[in-house]
């Protein structure tokens, strides 16, 4: 039987997509990425700088529940 690992799949969401009006976006919606994180090493929420296709620029993506 397999052990339960320390790695969990998390979703990262763009922080700027919610505040920018739809007229300034390339397409409607919110940018989201999925990734894995090690629960033992990073107990706090992830915050990475990723490319947002809706805004066509690099933005901060934060972990959501």
From Swiss-Prot:
Q: Which GO terms describe its biological process?
A: translation
InterPro entries the UniProt entry points to: Ribosomal_bL33, Ribosomal_bL33_CS, Ribosomal_bL33_sf, Ribosomal_zn-bd
Q: Quick one: where's region Disordered?
A: 20-40
Q: Which GO terms describe its cellular component?
A: cytoplasm; ribonucleoprotein complex; ribosome
Q: Which PROSITE patterns does this entry report, sorted A to Z?
A: RIBOSOMAL_L33 (PS00582)
Task: Extract the Pfam families matched here.
Answer: Ribosomal_L33
Q: Determine the domain of life of the protein's source.
A: Bacteria
Q: Does the keyword Ribosomal protein apply?
A: yes
Coiled-coil blocks: none
Keywords noted in UniProt: Ribonucleoprotein, Ribosomal protein
The terms under GO molecular function for this entry are:
structural constituent of ribosome
Q: Which family is annotated?
A: Belongs to the bacterial ribosomal protein bL33 family.
Return the HAMAP family for the record: Ribosomal_bL33
Q: Which named protein is this?
A: Large ribosomal subunit protein bL33
Q: Which gene encodes it?
A: rpmG
